[in-house]
A protein has these predicted regions:
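Acidic/His- and Gly-rich active-site-bordering loop/insert found
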Residues: 2-101, 110
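Active-site signature of alpha/beta-hydrolase-fold catalytic machinery across serine-
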Residues: 114
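Conserved small/polar residues in nucleotide/adenosyl-binding loops
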Residues: 117-119
Length: 119
């Protein structure tokens, strides 16, 4: 598989994003800090977004550079966590007692952010 150099160069930064998201799990419809973090990344990369869907949801939009088209593609990631204690002991373990990203949403959200940056 060929990985673009620009993506490869962002590996450590992306790992940091995933670790940050992992450390701030929040249950569904209450992901205020998570939503804030995602919006900060979208703003950092000048990606247009709208917020407030289902309380904390975000919709981002990336337009192509080859003219106006009515074609589109949808990508999505959940970013809610599970109401369960985290028993891991790494630096980026959950800061929120009784909540954990145990199903990969921290990784999925990181991959979606990367996709938006590189589309």
């Amino acid at each position: 598989m060929i990985v673009s150099n620009s993506i490869n160069q962002m590996f450590e930064e992306m790992r940091g994003w995933r670790h940050e998201l992992h450390s701030i799990p929040e249950i569904g419809l209450e992901e205020h800090e998570t939503s804030k973090y995602i919006k900060s990344k979208l703003s950092e990369f000048n990606i247009e977004f709208k917020e407030g869907y289902a309380n904390t949801g975000i919709v981002a939009r990336v337009k192509g550079s080859k003219g106006d088209s009515d074609k589109s593609i949808g990508l999505r990631a959940d970013f809610d966590a599970l109401p369960m204690p985290e028993k891991n002991e790494f630096k980026h373990k959950s800061k929120n007692e009784g909540m954990m990203h145990a199903c990969g949403h921290d990784g999925h959200t990181t991959m979606l952010l990367l996709s938006l940056i590189h589309i």
